[in-house]
């Protein structure tokens, strides 16, 4: 099974008569994606925030991040839905969030990219494919500037080196907090610079966040991370899946 889904739209057309059903994976409690909230979260971890938000939505939090969760001194949820706020917060710190099997799943995408391939894709298993590489927007390091809450002095934190430095500024609790944020920003900017899209015969064992090994495409072959999967079922084409993938640098 692919998990639990809620039908959000359906349509019919003719002739011949055909129908289309669209469904999304989301908690049964619609407030998770519709109710805007304003709250100041203080002295709390991302995991603790997720536990409270998941509980409010009537589902569980699945936390798959190594290490002890760090404490955030304060973060504002300002007229945002729980879904929007929590996804943005996770992204800020280099974590990914998805709703799957009636759970909010939080994981470290960079750590997942180091896992072994869940399947091998060859040209014979692809109904169609397309490849794209974009060098613009990739970085060798980063610099984050913030004002110290204690001294009110401007502090710069740098990671990496080279000529392509991503520069950001904003709020940070400490140097360690600023470093987490800029590392996450660099990883996010570099992810997906090489993309592969493929349509394959349906394989329900594959899920987004897994890696696959692509073979038989010459220099385009390699290990790819699955960003998204779209499942398609039709009377003429059977069960197929559209995979959007990003190359994993090895």
Stretches with model-predicted labels:
Residues 1-60:
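Surface-exposed cap/loop segments at beta↔alpha junctions
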Residues 1-6, 20, 38, 118, ...:
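Well-ordered beta-strand positions in beta-sheet-rich domains
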């Amino acid at each position: 099974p692919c998990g639990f889904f809620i039908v959000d739209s359906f349509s019919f057309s003719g002739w011949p008569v055909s129908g289309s059903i669209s469904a999304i994976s989301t908690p049964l409690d619609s407030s998770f994606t519709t109710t805007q909230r304003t709250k100041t979260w203080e002295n709390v971890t991302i995991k603790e925030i997720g536990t409270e938000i998941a509980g409010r939505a009537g589902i569980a939090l699945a936390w798959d991040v190594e290490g002890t969760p760090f404490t955030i001194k304060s973060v504002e949820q300002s007229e945002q839905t729980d879904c929007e706020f929590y996804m943005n917060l996770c992204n800020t710190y280099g974590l990914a969030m998805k709703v799957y099997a009636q759970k909010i799943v939080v994981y470290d995408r960079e750590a997942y990219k180091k896992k072994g391939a869940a399947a091998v894709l060859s040209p014979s298993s692809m109904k169609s494919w397309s490849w794209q590489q974009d060098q613009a927007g990739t970085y060798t390091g980063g610099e984050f500037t913030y004002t110290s809450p204690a001294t009110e002095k401007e502090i710069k934190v740098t990671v990496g080196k080279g000529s392509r430095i991503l520069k950001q500024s904003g709020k940070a609790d400490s140097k360690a907090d600023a470093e987490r944020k800029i590392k996450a920003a660099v990883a996010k900017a570099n992810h997906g610079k090489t993309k592969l899209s493929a349509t394959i015969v349906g394989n329900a064992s594959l899920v987004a966040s897994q890696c696959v090994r692509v073979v038989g495409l010459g220099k385009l072959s390699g290990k790819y991370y699955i960003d998204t999967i779209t499942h398609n079922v039709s009377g003429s084409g059977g069960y197929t899946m559209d995979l959007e993938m990003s190359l994993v640098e090895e």
